[in-house]
Amino acid sequence: IRVGGYEECADAQIIVITAGPSITPGNSRDRMVLLEKNVDVMNNIMEQITRYTKDAIIIVVSNPLDILTYIAQKKFDYPANKIFGTGTLLDTARFNKMLGDLCGVDAKNVTGFVLGEHGSTSFIPWNTVNIVGVPFDEFEKQFELKEKLDKEKLLHDTKVIGLDIVELKGYTSSGVALSACRLIGSIVRNEKSVVPVSTVVSG
């Protein structure tokens, strides 16, 4: 790891943007409080990047994620298909882990997506959630559950667990870093994976 200037983006294949302040313990639990400062940060970064390249794939991690991704896609005449955010990939991983734990199975066997905006307005399309083909509504018949499954509680816990980590640890790092690495790996290996990212949808 070393410090470099924006000119080094000229031949970059992938650029990951994590800059800007984050929410802190005891502060607001709403990522939108970061909006004004992080919009300025994003504008500055994109102005610098676009001086040197419009070829690299840009992955946005900074919050509020979806708004910053929108700004990066819309404002700088950068190819929109080369900019996206980590989206609800981390929310999805957390949900699958919680559901797997409740059902006594490895999270890798859980298929379920958290969709929408990263944060308080995300949602879960329950009719797509399954464990090795067993649909959500049949989990109570097929698995020895640790507790009764409550859709509202599962969604709520998925939304707030990151904020709870901030209160306990002071920041989040590992989960979102793994999400970014997951996307980078998918791109580099051309995996053709289906993952929930932040992007502007037209049409």
List PLM regions with ranges.
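C-terminal substrate-binding/catalytic lobe of Rossmann-fold NAD(P)-dependent dehydrogenases
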Residues: 76-82, 91-203
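Solvent-exposed alpha-helices and their adjacent loops that cap or buttress functional pockets
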Residues: 7-9, 51-53, 103-106, 187
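General small-molecule cofactor/ligand-binding pocket signal
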Residues: 2-4, 84, 113
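Acidic ATP/Mg2+-coordinating residue in the GHKL
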Residues: 18
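Short, internal active-site loops enriched in acidic
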Residues: 7-9, 63-67, 117-119, 202-203
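Rossmann-like NAD(P)(H) cofactor-binding subdomain of soluble oxidoreductases
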Residues: 29-96
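Conserved N-terminal Rossmann-fold NAD(P) cofactor-binding segment
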Residues: 1-13, 21-28
